[in-house]
């Protein structure tokens, strides 16, 4: 017991309420260095606690003797504690250096206590003496300290229990007793639920918005310590007591977003552990259109730290390209990719998502050949091989292989493809440009191209399952790998068909297995090289035809079944069947677009689709004369722009309506094309042509203003406005067919072109306004100059004579090729569109060179 008294007297301090009252109540918490004892003084020994803390190292050694009986007293109060104490001291007394050990123990505990005391005092002076204003005061006043000053003192010291992490001498009891206050400034725990909440928040895995700043002790100990260091400007609780701390006053932070973690990618990269506490959320998730990245869902699919691998700034890897290593060729565009309405996450099922795939444009564009800002609209559905970025693969194809199909997709030849297709006019107007450069050489499809671009098995309208055509490997390895996208216009079905993803997607060694190395597709569409489909058939065409936008000769044939294949508009991968061919093939163009199309804007896609449906497999039946190249409808020299992808207005139910790629309208008197061949409404097309920039959607209106062209009315010799209108009414229904047939007739063959030119000289406007490179241009110009547009009725009459056109029906379309000039009046008659739209580049207006210019630029 000497040991007890000796060290024990110091220790006898157990009576010293601080340690041993604790011992009484909490003595069950024991630690070798008595640290157990000291901390639990909740019993009421706050006074003793104060004395102990107030004394320098151990006053107990000085006056501890007076309390030397404490073991007895302790036994009275807490027999168990006394037993432990005796056992401990007795053991110490038997140690060789008992005095020194005991002294050392006490000193260590004293140092801990002293430090604790100093910290307590400092904090108390800072937090309590300044009489914290506002919330702090209200809390203190609201909370009558239940345990009295002792508890208050204890709790104030509790924040010191930060030292639990530094000085592990606290007893478990204390931890349990004041677990929360430990992290906050002095106030009784129980009465401050907010503290518990904050403590929970501090300890909680969900980090506050200030998370990037590692919590510091001072800040942790203060009520709003977790807040970023800012001046706290609230009237209450101005945190004056922070002055003593090195923590500057700070403003309370906004609620941390549970979804957007505050950590930067750099932090994540360096401290991967930080991400564990953060919700797995990132802006990476591709909008549903792209959601294909890994699981085909738009949910949080990748840990945010995957951003860092993406070369897209801000971690906005909307394309999921970080996983899509094959798409690096499109990388440059990723940074200026645009959130177009079709991409919008809000329109998950956007029907255009497939029609206008969001393939990055800029990377592969030849800026010189790209006539509008790359992000201006959807990429040409035909001209660009587009990986699907959609998670809802079912949209495009029923047999979506797996969400992996997107990630595996690679676009090796993407740039070359884009080059060939983007230079709209340079390329043969063939929408399918062979990746092996055939398109550049103008060696368009020779022989009956079997452009069964996966879904686009033209001859049989039914969809050819690419898996049948391509096999299930990387598109049947037998297919020559030389041509990646043999044609820009491979249908979405091909790109997106299940087997497409299976093989790793974009690396279609040869999208069309049937394509032989030469790119000669030899089995699908029954187009002769002589057909308008083959560019060579175009009279004015040479492999490098003029660099202005070709307006008319090619049309995209959307395999009708393919169009809506996934239930959404598939890309219209038109094989650029010339519009004339389409016209030749269309059985009853009237049944197709009700919107009258001007001669310059043949609804070729619809017509071709129609013809494909009806007579795709067979030779075109509607050629005015089989001998004349079907293409004649558009003098190939006339840069007729490809038909609207959406083609038929009211026609083929399978064909989605033509939609403006800029404003997404489906109603326009005249369909135009952007440099890439994508359909633009008249307004957007004109705007682009005139201003060189994409028409802002803010200008979009639902009202189509019709302009009375006095010039057109005057030009129409002997035709009164009313007569025009009446004829217009009559012809409007058939307008598409009319323009088509007339065009077919007029440009049906180079001879017809010649005829048209001569006619033009006679003052009749050839319908194909674009002057062929040969005489027709001059003829056209002359014709325009002397545009004597016969009234529609006259036109019709003239048409009637021309029996060559099978569709002659009363519609003007049956104008004979020579009557091309007469047909031209028809174009104005196409009235609603033509007259309404100056943009109607129909020579209907007959406005001289300006119209020629319009013709040249019409595809815009």
From Swiss-Prot:
Organism taxonomic ancestry: Eukaryota, Fungi, Dikarya, Ascomycota, Pezizomycotina
Ranges where the record places region Disordered: 1-24, 116-159, 174-193, 559-600, 612-658, 706-850
Top-rank taxon, per record: Eukaryota
PROSITE patterns with a match to the protein in the record: GATA_ZN_FINGER_1, GATA_ZN_FINGER_2
UniProt organism field: Penicillium roqueforti
Subcellular localization(s) per the UniProt record: Nucleus
The protein's name: Nitrogen regulatory protein areA
Main location: nucleus
One of the protein's GO biological processes: positive regulation of transcription by RNA polymerase II
GATA-type zinc-finger residues: 660-684
């Amino acid at each position: 017991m000497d040991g007890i008294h000796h060290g024990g007297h110091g220790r006898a301090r157990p009576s010293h309420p601080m340690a041993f009252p604790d011992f009484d109540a909490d003595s069950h918490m024991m630690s070798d260095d008595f640290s157990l004892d000291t901390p639990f003084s909740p019993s009421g020994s706050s006074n003793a606690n104060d004395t102990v803390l107030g004394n320098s190292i151990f006053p107990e050694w000085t006056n501890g003797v007076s309390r030397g009986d404490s073991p007895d007293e302790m036994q009275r109060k807490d027999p168990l504690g006394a037993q432990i104490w005796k056992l401990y001291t007795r053991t110490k007394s038997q140690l060789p250096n008992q005095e020194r050990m005991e002294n050392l123990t006490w000193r260590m505990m004293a140092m801990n206590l002293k430090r604790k005391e100093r910290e307590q005092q400092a904090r108390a002076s800072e937090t309590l003496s300044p009489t914290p204003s506002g919330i702090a005061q209200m809390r203190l006043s609201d909370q009558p300290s239940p345990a009295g000053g002792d508890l208050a003192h204890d709790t104030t010291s509790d924040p010191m229990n930060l030292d639990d992490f530094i000085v592990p001498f606290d007893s478990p009891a204390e931890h349990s007793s004041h677990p929360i206050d430990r992290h906050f400034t002095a106030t009784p725990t129980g009465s401050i639920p907010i503290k518990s909440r904050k403590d929970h928040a501090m300890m909680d895995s969900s980090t506050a918005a200030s998370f990037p700043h590692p919590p510091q002790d001072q800040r942790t100990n203060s009520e709003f310590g977790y807040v970023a260091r800012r001046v706290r400007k609230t009237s209450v609780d101005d945190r004056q007591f922070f002055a003593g701390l090195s923590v500057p006053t700070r403003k309370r932070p906004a609620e941390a977003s549970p979804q957007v973690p505050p950590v930067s990618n750099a932090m994540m990269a360096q401290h991967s552990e930080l991400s564990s506490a953060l919700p797995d959320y990132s802006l990476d998730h591709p909008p549903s259109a792209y959601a294909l990245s890994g699981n085909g869902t738009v949910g949080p699919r990748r840990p945010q730290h995957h951003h860092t691998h993406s070369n897209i700034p801000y971690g906005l890897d909307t394309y999921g390209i970080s996983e899509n290593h094959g798409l690096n060729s499109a990388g440059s565009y990723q940074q200026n990719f645009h959130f177009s309405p079709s991409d919008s996450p809000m329109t998950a099922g956007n029907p255009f998502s497939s029609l206008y795939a969001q393939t990055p444009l800029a990377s592969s564009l030849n800026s010189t050949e790209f006539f509008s800002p790359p992000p201006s609209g959807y990429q040409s559905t035909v001209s660009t091989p587009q990986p699907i970025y959609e998670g809802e693969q079912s949209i495009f194809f029923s047999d979506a292989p797996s969400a992996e199909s997107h990630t595996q997709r690679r676009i090796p030849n993407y740039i070359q493809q884009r080059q060939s297709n983007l230079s709209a006019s340079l390329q043969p107007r063939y929408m399918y440009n062979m990746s092996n450069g055939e398109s550049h050489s103008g060696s368009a499809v020779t022989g009956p191209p079997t452009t069964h671009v996966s879904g686009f098995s033209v001859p049989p309208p039914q969809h050819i399952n690419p898996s049948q055509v391509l096999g299930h490997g990387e598109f049947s390895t037998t297919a020559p790998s030389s041509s990646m996208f043999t044609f820009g216009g491979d249908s979405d079905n091909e790109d997106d068909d299940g087997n497409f993803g299976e093989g790793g997607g974009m690396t279609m060694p040869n999208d069309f297995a049937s394509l032989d190395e030469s790119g000669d597709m030899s089995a699908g569409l029954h187009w002769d090289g002589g057909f308008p489909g083959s560019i060579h058939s175009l009279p004015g065409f040479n492999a490098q035809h003029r660099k202005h936008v070709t307006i008319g000769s090619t049309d995209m044939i959307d395999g009708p079944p393919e169009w809506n294949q996934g239930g959404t508009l598939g890309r219209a991968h038109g094989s650029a069947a010339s519009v004339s061919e389409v016209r030749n093939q269309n059985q009853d163009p009237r049944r197709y677009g009700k919107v009258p199309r001007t001669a310059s804007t043949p609804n070729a896609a619809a017509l071709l689709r129609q013809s494909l449906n009806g007579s795709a497999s067979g030779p075109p039946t509607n050629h005015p004369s089989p001998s004349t190249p079907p293409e004649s409808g558009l003098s190939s020299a006339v840069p007729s722009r490809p038909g609207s992808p959406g083609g038929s207005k009211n026609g083929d139910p399978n064909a989605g309506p033509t939609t403006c790629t800029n404003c997404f309208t489906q109603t326009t008197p005249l369909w135009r094309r952007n440099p890439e061949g994508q359909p633009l409404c008249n307004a957007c097309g004109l705007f682009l042509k005139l201003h060189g920039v994409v028409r802002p959607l803010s200008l979009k209106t639902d009202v189509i203003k019709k302009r009375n062209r006095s010039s057109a009315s005057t030009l129409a010799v002997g035709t009164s406005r009313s007569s025009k209108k009446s004829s217009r009414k009559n012809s409007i229904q058939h307008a598409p067919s009319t323009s088509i047939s007339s065009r077919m007739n007029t440009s049906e063959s180079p001879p017809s072109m010649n005829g048209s030119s001569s006619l033009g000289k006679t003052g009749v406007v050839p319908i194909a306004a674009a002057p062929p490179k040969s005489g027709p241009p001059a003829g056209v110009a002359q014709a325009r100059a002397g545009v004597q547009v016969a009234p529609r009725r006259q036109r019709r009459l003239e048409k009637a004579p021309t029996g060559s056109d099978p569709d002659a029906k009363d519609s003007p379309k049956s104008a004979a090729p020579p009557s091309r000039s007469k047909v031209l009046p028809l174009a104005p008659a196409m009235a609603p569109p033509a007259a309404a739209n100056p943009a109607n580049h129909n020579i209907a207006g007959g406005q001289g060179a300006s119209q020629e210019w319009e013709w040249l630029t019409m595809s815009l």
